[in-house]
C-alpha cells in the first residue's frame, strides 16, 4: 500500500472544497437577488424573510447536526447532509414566489448546518493542536471562495439561461462533492495511505481530550453550564450578523445604494470575499506567531486574533461617511478580512477547550447562538434598510464585534472546559 506524505493536507483540501460548494449554494440566492426581486415581484422585506428562513433553519439545526456528526462520525454524517443540501438547492429552481424560495432555502439551511461542525471535527481528527488553526483557516477560506465565485457564476447562468439554472448547477456540484467525500475521507486510524510518522505526529500533537476516544461524552446540559461555552457562544452571537450581512446583502446593497447593474455586481461583489479568504488564511497563522512573539498560550493567542479582527471591523462601520462606491467596496474588503480572521479563531476555540467526543456538539451549540443573531439581524435589515439605509446597520455590526472581543476576554478562561467544570464542583464533567 503506497504511503502519501502530508496526507492531512489533502484531507483538509477535501474539506475546503466542500465548504466552497456549500457557500456557493448558500450565496446563489444573494447573487441572484436583483433578478429574483424583479421577476417574482419580491420586496426588500420579503427578501429578508427568505434570508431569515435559511438562517433560522440553520440555527435550529446547528446543535442537531453537531450531535449527528458525533454519533455517525465525520465521514457518513457529512456526506448525508451534503447530499441533502445539494438536492434542496436544485429544488429551489421550482419556486415561483418568495414563499416558495423561503421554504427551499430553509431546507438548504437545515442541511448546511453541518458544514462548519463537520469541518472542525475533521480538523480535530487530522491535525495536532499547533496546526489546527491553520487547518480551520484553510477550510474556512472555502466559505469566502464560495461566496466569491457565486456572483460571476450566477450572473453567467442568468444571462445564458435563467436564474433557475444557477440553483441547478450549484446543487449538482455539491452532489458530486458528496460522492467524492464518501470515497476519499477516512479517519487517520483507518487511513492506510497515512505514513506512520504522520500518524504519530497527529496523535502526539493533540491535547489529552482529543487523544482518548473512549472517554464519556459531556452531555448537552454540562456543555451549556460550562462558562467556556458562553465565552465562545456570546462572541459568536455578536460576530455572525456581520458575515450574514456580507453573504446575503452585499449584491443588493450595491444595487440599491449605488445603482450597480448585474454586470457590475459580477465585477465587484466578489472582492470582499477575496479579502475574506486572506483573513481566513492569515487568521490561521497568527495564533502560533502570537504564541512565539508574546509567550502566550494557545487560547490567549486566539483571543488576540479575535480582538484584532474586531478593531478592523471599524472600517466597514464607517461606510456611511463616504459616497464613493469604490471606497465602500474597499471598506467592505477590510470587513471581509476582519470578520473571517476573527471567525476562524472563534470556531477553532471550540476544539481547543472541548474534547473530541463533544467538539461537534459544542460547536453546533455555539453555531446556533451565532445563527440566531444572524437570523434576527436579517429581519432588522429587511425592516429598516429602505427607511434608514444600510449605513447605520454597518455601524452596528462594528459595535457588535467590539463587544464580542470584550466578552471573550472577560468570560473565557485560558484552560480546557473539563478543568473549568471540575473547578466549579457543581456539575463535574466526565473525566477524559
From Swiss-Prot:
Disruption phenotype: Mutant is unable to grow on either glucuronate or galacturonate, but is able to grow on fructuronate or tagaturonate. GO terms for molecular function: hexuronate transmembrane transporter activity. It is a multi-pass membrane protein. Keywords: Cell inner membrane, Cell membrane, Membrane, Signal, Transmembrane, Transmembrane helix, Transport. Residues 1-31 form the signal peptide. One of its GO terms (biological process) is hexuronate transmembrane transport. It comes from the Bacteria. One of its GO terms (cellular component) is plasma membrane. InterPro entries: MFS, MFS_dom, MFS_Na/Anion_cotransporter, MFS_trans_sf. Residues 70-75, 121-138, 186-236, 286-293, 339-369, 413-432 are cytoplasmic. SUPFAM superfamilies: MFS general substrate transporter. Transport of aldohexuronates such as D-glucuronate and D-galacturonate. Under anaerobic conditions, can play a critical role as a D-glucose transporter in the absence of sugar-PTS system. PANTHER family: HEXURONATE TRANSPORTER (PTHR11662:SF285), SOLUTE CARRIER FAMILY 17 (PTHR11662). This is Hexuronate transporter.
Amino acid at each position: 500500500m503506497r504511503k502519501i506524505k502530508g496526507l492531512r493536507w489533502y484531507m483538509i483540501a477535501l474539506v475546503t472544497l466542500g465548504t466552497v460548494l456549500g457557500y456557493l449554494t448558500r450565496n446563489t440566492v444573494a447573487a441572484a437577488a436583483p433578478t429574483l426581486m424583479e421577476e417574482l415581484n419580491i420586496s426588500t422585506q420579503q427578501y429578508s424573510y427568505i434570508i431569515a428562513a435559511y438562517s433560522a433553519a440553520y440555527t435550529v439545526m446547528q446543535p442537531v447536526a453537531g450531535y449527528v456528526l458525533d454519533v455517525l462520525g465525520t465521514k457518513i454524517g457529512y456526506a448525508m447532509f451534503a447530499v441533502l443540501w445539494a438536492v434542496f438547492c436544485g429544488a429551489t429552481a421550482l419556486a415561483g414566489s418568495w414563499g416558495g424560495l423561503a421554504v427551499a432555502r430553509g431546507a438548504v439551511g437545515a442541511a448546511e448546518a453541518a458544514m462548519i461542525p463537520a469541518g472542525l471535527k475533521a480538523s480535530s481528527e487530522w491535525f495536532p493542536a499547533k496546526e489546527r488553526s491553520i487547518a480551520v483557516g484553510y477550510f474556512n477560506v472555502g466559505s469566502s471562495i464560495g461566496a466569491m465565485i457565486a456572483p460571476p457564476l450566477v450572473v453567467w447562468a442568468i444571462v445564458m439561461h435563467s436564474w433557475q439554472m444557477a440553483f441547478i448547477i450549484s446543487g449538482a456540484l455539491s452532489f458530486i462533492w458528496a460522492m467524492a467525500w464518501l470515497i476519499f475521507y477516512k479517519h487517520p486510524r483507518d487511513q492506510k495511505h497515512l505514513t506512520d510518522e504522520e500518524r504519530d505526529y497527529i496523535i502526539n500533537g493533540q491535547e489529552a481530550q482529543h487523544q482518548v476516544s473512549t472517554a464519556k461524552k459531556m452531555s448537552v446540559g454540562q456543555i451549556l453550564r460550562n462558562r467556556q461555552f458562553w465565552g465562545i457562544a456570546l462572541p459568536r452571537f455578536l460576530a455572525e450578523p456581520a458575515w450574514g450581512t456580507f453573504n446575503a446583502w452585499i449584491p443588493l446593497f450595491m444595487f440599491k445604494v449605488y445603482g450597480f447593474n448585474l454586470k457590475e455586481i459580477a465585477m465587484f461583489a466578489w472582492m470582499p470575499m477575496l479579502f475574506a479568504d486572506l483573513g481566513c488564511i492569515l487568521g490561521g497563522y497568527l495564533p502560533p506567531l502570537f504564541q512565539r512573539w508574546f509567550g502566550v498560550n494557545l487560547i490567549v493567542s486566539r483571543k488576540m486574533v479575535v480582538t484584532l479582527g474586531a478593531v478592523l471591523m471599524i472600517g466597514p462601520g464607517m461606510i456611511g461617511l463616504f459616497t464613493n462606491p469604490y471606497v465602500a467596496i474597499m471598506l467592505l474588503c477590510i470587513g471581509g478580512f476582519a470578520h473571517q480572521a476573527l471567525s476562524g479563531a472563534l470556531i477553532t476555540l471550540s476544539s481547543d477547550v472541548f474534547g473530541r467526543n463533544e467538539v461537534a456538539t459544542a460547536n453546533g451549540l455555539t453555531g446556533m447562538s451565532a445563527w440566531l443573531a444572524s437570523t434576527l439581524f436579517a429581519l432588522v435589515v429587511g425592516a429598516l434598510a429602505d427607511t434608514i439605509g444600510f449605513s447605520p446597520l454597518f455601524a452596528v455590526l462594528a459595535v457588535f464585534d467590539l463587544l464580542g472581543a470584550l466578552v471573550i476576554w472577560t468570560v473565557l478562561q485560558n484552560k480546557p472546559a473539563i478543568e473549568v467544570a471540575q473547578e466549579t464542583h457543581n456539575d463535574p464533567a466526565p473525566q477524559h
